[in-house]
Amino acid sequence: MAISLEKGQRIDLTKGKAGLSKLMVGLGWDPVSSGGGFFSKLLGGGGPNIDCDASVLMLENGKFTDKKNLIYFGNLKSRCGGVQHTGDNLTGDGAGDDEQIMIDLDKVPGNIDKLVFVVNIYDCVRRKQDFGMIQNAFIRVVDQSNHEEMLKYNLRDNYAGRTSLITAEIYRSGSEWKFAAVGEGTNDTRLEDIISRYV
């Protein structure tokens, strides 16, 4: 059974789990319904069309040092093959994961000590959109070897006015890997702004 995490909690991912290397990190969200009744939903109305994008920053000693260490819809796979984005979901509609990132911890180079998972809203300024228009946001980790959900973190804070979310981190702790539920909303409007926090 998956462990449910709260903001600020940390958990061992690999300790006591010999051979665990391949993970699937799923991120999901839903647009807040604007109502509109049955016919609105039937005709495709309801919530606003919000294009959230999940990305991973691969950090070296806590710093972002190479633009190729940004894995997102424009660069789907890391050079090492340890981080792979499966592609962009443009609407966030439907149940389950909206975007998925495949991780192979054994392939992540030794100089990379942290993977930061962020979500931002594409073109948020022009579209006047923020995370107050999103509900049911979560990040979860699945063991790819048996498809078992290991943990899930539901982002329950009020993120109204926030345009980016630093959802979680997977980081080295000695010879093991840990997961941290971060859940920090920011006013960064572009991926470059988020990256600048780690330069």
Curated annotation (Swiss-Prot):
Arranged from A to Z, the UniProt key words for this protein are:
Cytoplasm, Stress response
Q: Where does it live in the cell? A: Cytoplasm
CDD domains registered for this protein in UniProt: TerD_like
Q: Can you supply one Gene Ontology CC term for this chain's record?
A: cytoplasm
Name the InterPro entries on file: Stress/Tellurium_Resist, TerD
Pfam families, per database record = TerD (PF02342)
Q: Give the induction note.
A: In response to low temperature and salt stress.
Keyword Ribonucleoprotein included in the entry's annotation: no
Q: Does the keyword Zinc apply?
A: no
State the similarity comment: Belongs to the CAPAB/TerDEXZ family.
Record protein name field: Stress response protein SCP2
Q: Could you tell me which species this protein originates from? A: Bacillus subtilis (strain 168)
UniProt gene name: yceC
